[in-house]
Amino acid sequence: MRTLFIGDLHLSADRPDITSAFRRFLSQSFDDVDALYILGDLFEVWVGDDIAEPFALDIAADIAALSHKLPIYFIHGNRDFLIGKQFAAISKMQLLDEVHQINLYGIPTLLLHGDSLCTLDKGYQRFRWFRNQPWVKWIYSKLSQSKRLSIAANLRAKSKAGNQLKSQYIMDAEPHAVADLLQKHSCRQMIHGHTHRPAIHHESAGTRIVVGDWYSQSSVLEMTAEGPNLQAKPLGGS
């Protein structure tokens, strides 16, 4: 048996190639799969369940169809942190906490999106704290669709411009943050995304596995009792 992990697909109507690759992934055989975990940033942007576009509802239907075969779990990313119970219900995904612990074939394992590990990026962490305040989410939910989309587009533009000025080092998972979180939860293994740097890191605190993004290829982490297997395929298939 195996368990699959994906993340950072950044699905949008503007990238039909990614959407097609995701649908091919969902159409494969899952007979020997225990569960599928989506570790955030399933969508490029999400401004609220109440104004989900037809594209997103089609994706929800695709995911729901697979849910009849196996459980599907979702952890919020920094792009789709506003996905709520309404969308989870129609897509048949089970929402998990920001940091979730599972027993993965005998190994206590932490699952998370990964942006909380980039602690050297002080500016982003301040924004992240502000963004997660319940009152901020409440005010945002009361805005019109056009206003929410405008704010989201502005934030993405600022983030892209700001990231070009930051070193790759501060935008990666900080080793002490990784070690502290593993120690806090008494785990020796962690799986996350966000950084778009797929790799298997064997560190003193434990094993850290990073799932890749889907911008130029599909990226799937397969976990079995024998260990991890990071898989990548061209978006066009084959």
UniProtKB/Swiss-Prot annotation:
GO terms for biological process: lipid A biosynthetic process. GO terms for molecular function: manganese ion binding; UDP-2,3-diacylglucosamine hydrolase activity. Its EC number is 3.6.1.54. It is found in: Cell inner membrane. It comes from the Bacteria. Belongs to the LpxH family. It comes from Shewanella amazonensis (strain ATCC BAA-1098 / SB2B). Hydrolyzes the pyrophosphate bond of UDP-2,3-diacylglucosamine to yield 2,3-diacylglucosamine 1-phosphate (lipid X) and UMP by catalyzing the attack of water at the alpha-P atom. Involved in the biosynthesis of lipid A, a phosphorylated glycolipid that anchors the lipopolysaccharide to the outer membrane of the cell. Binds 2 Mn(2+) ions per subunit in a binuclear metal center. Pathway: Glycolipid biosynthesis; lipid IV(A) biosynthesis; lipid IV(A) from (3R)-3-hydroxytetradecanoyl-[acyl-carrier-protein] and UDP-N-acetyl-alpha-D-glucosamine: step 4/6. This is UDP-2,3-diacylglucosamine hydrolase. Its main location: membrane. InterPro entries: Calcineurin-like_PHP_ApaH, LpxH-like, Metallo-depent_PP-like, UDP-diacylglucosamine_Hdrlase. It catalyses: UDP-2-N,3-O-bis[(3R)-3-hydroxytetradecanoyl]-alpha-D-glucosamine + H2O = 2-N,3-O-bis[(3R)-3-hydroxytetradecanoyl]-alpha-D-glucosaminyl 1-phosphate + UMP + 2 H(+). Keywords: Cell inner membrane, Cell membrane, Hydrolase, Lipid A biosynthesis, Lipid biosynthesis, Lipid metabolism, Manganese, Membrane, Metal-binding. Substrate binds at N78, R79, D121, S159, N163, K166, H194. Its cofactor is Mn(2+). NCBIfam families: lipid_A_lpxH, PRK05340.1. One of its GO terms (cellular component) is extrinsic component of plasma membrane. Transmembrane segments: none annotated.
